[in-house]
């Protein structure tokens, strides 16, 4: 059996038609969004037409039952980051590859244990692998998810500082970016970390042509001064 075809079919079975992750036990520890959190995420400015234009797509795809803002920041993901197999040079070669590999990442949400999730995914991949193939799963690094209460004293002070500096009521949201050390701060140092985002949607974080709006930068300075 062609390894590239086998791997493609295997990975295709990891996501259901409704956009959910097809790994037994994957969602067992996921904490449901509260009504308060859903109201806050609903306040995040959103236009489906503008979002599709920004992404360069004609149609959005995601987990059914959740809005795009909820999917992006509050639901776990299973993503293929890269696929490698067969001839990659110029022109074509009528070969059958001897191997195929994929790089996979999963963004987790509060209460999910990364070591447990890695075990579940590895076990499921091996269980689904066809008998004609030999599969090896190499586990990479992992970090625990982190969330902080938006109603504590420091949170209230931060929100008031943002409102003073920017002249608008702050919008609370969850973010899928990974900063593993903030969970260590909470677990080891017993302190909360508040991530006060100043970037705009088109600032291209960690991407080519990354930028930062000067007005947002300046108002961020005032926000920090107000807070501390």
Where are these regions (language model features)?
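Alpha-helical metal-binding/catalytic segments enriched in His/Glu/Asp
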Residues: 1-18, 104, 220-227
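An extended, acidic, His-containing surface patch that forms the Zn2+-binding/catalytic region
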Residues: 21-99, 107-120, 128, 132-228
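Generic solvent-exposed, charged/amphipathic alpha-helical segments
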Residues: 8, 12, 122-126, 159
